[in-house]
Amino acid sequence: MQQRRPVRRALLSVSDKAGIIEFAQALSARGVELLSTGGTARLLAEKGLPVTEVSDYTGFPEMMDGRVKTLHPKVHGGILGRRGQDDAIMEQHHIAPIDMVVVNLYPFAETVAREGCSLEDAVENIDIGGPTMVRSAAKNHKDVAIVVKSSDYDAIIKEMDANEGSLTLDTRFDLAIKAFEHTAAYDSMIANYFGSMVPAYHGESKEAAGRFPRTLNLNFIKKQDMRYGENSHQQAAFYIEENVKEASVATAQQVQGKALSYNNIADTDAALECVKEFNEPACVIVKHANPCGVAVSTTILDAYDRAYKTDPTSAFGGIIAFNRELDAETAQAIISRQFVEVIIAPSATEDALKITAAKQNVRVLTCGQWAQRVPGLDFKRVNGGLLVQDRDLGMVSEAELRVVSKRQPTEQELRDALFCWKVAKFVKSNAIVYAKENMTIGIGAGQMSRVYSAKIAGIKAADEGLEVKGSAMASDAFFPFRDGIDAAAAVGVSCVIQPGGSIRDDEVIAAADEHGIAMIFTDMRHFRH
């Protein structure tokens, strides 16, 4: 597929003008005639480039506040005309061939994301002429190059220089695929935006816009192929969203180590999202998507030491996340103590990276600092469908807690309860977390019965020689029976935090009172499956 087509005439019309001046200058320097519209044409003219306004080229002015610019036979005939087949009809109607179209579309996503965006604003940012030109050029990729991404500008100029001003069919075909992906994503955004309004239009909701659209169109960009998926017989790849506004695994920069695996990414996401819950210097160690050690302290070194003590056995080969910059002292403590798959932090000092570089297999990611969590959607694939829900960003404050036991918690118990409640949110259900003095001392995860999660948390603490007496226990959901409270009391738990809501709440509260345990209700559940 090496059939070449020279680029003699290009039409440039972009909303995102990053790099467009330099690209236009490079095209013009290579003898390419430039056509352009509106703001793009004015910008190029201001830079001294010879550019023809599309309205002058067609003999037809822009109208309706710019709604009609390029929807003209001289434009689309020049793009869609098949070289060697439509030449006579093009000549008859004075239609010149357009060999390259450089277009990106009105910023619809950015517009509707702005607070207070009206329906009228959204409508005016639906591009019509742009997608039409993009699709026309992509359809006729045998003769025309369509450029929708500024990241392709340099490569296009290099190829033109290597091919006497021409582009190969391979390149034009690849650009066409990107163009169709671009317009598909654009139409999906518009469909999702208007689809979310359907319930309101039909009187099914009092909200101005329903939370979920009638049809859901998703657009993700492949970031990397994986060696394999969750298991070696499964193929896999990692896709990311565009314009992610929150520090995440998807946007993190890998500064050291071999390529991330499928399981690395899943586990690192779990660790990072957990450590984001804490304002104090914090460390989270994750194994198989479950926290196995969490602590907060005055420094991340001390937080790491305390998190590691929870379960050194499980920490081997784990993922470590911090909410502060990784420093050399902490990096040295990790490298000298354990095997670790991934370390992720907002940033890392040069000295820390020199230390981790001694272990080439250790992957180090920096994700940038975060200010607040960004609402969004969570997805879970089921056979034949997709479950969609809001991200679980819920968290209770001290003022929202309800003490339901006879005994009030002490200040330390209250701090420990709130700490382990944050951790329990990220442990697979049924989740039980024991904590004392801002560190986890036992975690029971993923058991089918809640009482066994409570027992396992106690066993883990005993195995590591950690003192449970006087600790707090968090449960991600209510206790259906009193047995979980009895199990906690047997190992010395003195305070329990849980959502409440069981039909046997009275029995559970009575059990707490019998054991002298302070019990706190959050009225919020944190199932995690």
UniProtKB/Swiss-Prot annotation:
Pfam families for the chain:
AICARFT_IMPCHas, MGS
Among InterPro entries, the record links this protein to:
AICAR_Tfase_dup_dom_sf, Cytidine_deaminase-like, MGS-like_dom, MGS-like_dom_sf, PurH-like
Q: Where is the MGS-like domain?
A: 1-148
Return one Gene Ontology term, BP aspect. 'de novo' IMP biosynthetic process
> Which keywords accompany this UniProt record?
Hydrolase, Multifunctional enzyme, Purine biosynthesis, Transferase
What GO molecular functions are on record for this protein? IMP cyclohydrolase activity; phosphoribosylaminoimidazolecarboxamide formyltransferase activity
Q: Give the gene name.
A: purH
Pathway in which this enzyme or protein is active: Purine metabolism; IMP biosynthesis via de novo pathway; 5-formamido-1-(5-phospho-D-ribosyl)imidazole-4-carboxamide from 5-amino-1-(5-phospho-D-ribosyl)imidazole-4-carboxamide (10-formyl THF route): step 1/1; Purine metabolism; IMP biosynthesis via de novo pathway; IMP from 5-formamido-1-(5-phospho-D-ribosyl)imidazole-4-carboxamide: step 1/1
Q: What's in the domain note?
A: The IMP cyclohydrolase activity resides in the N-terminal region.
GO cellular component, as recorded: cytosol
EC annotation? 2.1.2.3, 3.5.4.10
Query: What family does this belong to?
Result: Belongs to the PurH family.
Q: Please, which domain of life does this record's source organism belong to?
A: Bacteria
Which reaction(s) are listed as its catalytic activity? (6R)-10-formyltetrahydrofolate + 5-amino-1-(5-phospho-beta-D-ribosyl)imidazole-4-carboxamide = 5-formamido-1-(5-phospho-D-ribosyl)imidazole-4-carboxamide + (6S)-5,6,7,8-tetrahydrofolate; IMP + H2O = 5-formamido-1-(5-phospho-D-ribosyl)imidazole-4-carboxamide
**Species for this entry:** Salmonella paratyphi A (strain AKU_12601)
What protein does this entry describe?
Answer: Bifunctional purine biosynthesis protein PurH
